Amino acid sequence: MNEFMKKLSLTKPIIQAPMAGGITKPRLASAVSNQGALGSLASGYLKPELLEQQIKEMFELTDAPFQINVFVPLGLEMPPEDQVTKWKENIPLANQVNQFTPVQEEWDDFYQKIDMILRYKVKACSFTFDLPPEDAVKELKTAGCCLIGTASTVEEALLMEERGMDIVVLQGSEAGGHRGAFLPSKGESAIGLMALIPQAADALSVPVIAAGGIIDHRGVKAALTLGAQGVQIGSAFLICHESSAHPVHKQKIREANEADTKLTKLFSGKEARGIVNKWMEEKEQYETQTLPYPYQNTLTKAMRQQASLQNNHDQMSLWAGQGIRSLTEEMSVKQLLHKLCPEDIKI
């Protein structure tokens, strides 16, 4: 048992990725925690009162540790009105948006969620999109909460460690969903996991976790060999029986292969890897002209919601990583974790 597993009282070196948007609800997260891995709730896009309901439900379903992931607000200024108008004309239903959420309201939401994590004594809290503010870090660490940061480069990982993270998740370019990158890059920033793990493991003193394209025990073993103390997995859990992902999303993952995904900003304004669909193909020429996150995300929300109601995969954000070719079978969390971490795996 390594340091990461000891910190969180785990029997398996696995974190179920906290996938926002209604995918990782208590049924999935508790099933993961009950099998000795770390289940995760995603607070992104959730109102604090709904997060509280999910926390209460988690405590009813499991006595094992779990984590809550929190988006760190980016605090970006509102884009120019002419750019907003242009995108409203190009996104179905975007004209329904009359105003964007004020930055201060996003920070209020962030701190309400931190207070909730403290109040309910949640075992671990992870952060995505930026360095968490120092006051939140201090409060959580004083309360004994294990802190997990997300990084896509060694430099970002070092900053996360310096900020006080107990564990750092290294997100390779293979990973599905939103990139956790938060620093500008001079060159190619989409670093693959095989290059990222050993460099970060050598540079950091805290445990590092590998994320991106891992779907079976071979990927787990490889990550551990390269210096990671655990792995974080999203796509494979997304298609489990217990997942609340849209049935069409699950189906498209089962049908896709590694060449069917790409990084795009079109849905949210922030790079995210998903299965290519008609919306991405039609708007590809505008990839470099999107509004910054979360403004683009707000404008596409109604379109994505309508697409989900209509089972229309062509306008859904079908987040998935590059390891999906062999994800052809829907299984239970228990079955998946046995596949990921058979009894003979050495940790």
Where are these regions (language model features)?
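Active-site entrance/lid segments in N-terminal catalytic domains of soluble metabolic enzymes
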Residues: 1-203
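Conserved active-site-proximal phosphate/metal-binding subdomains
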Residues: 179-183, 187-209, 214-347
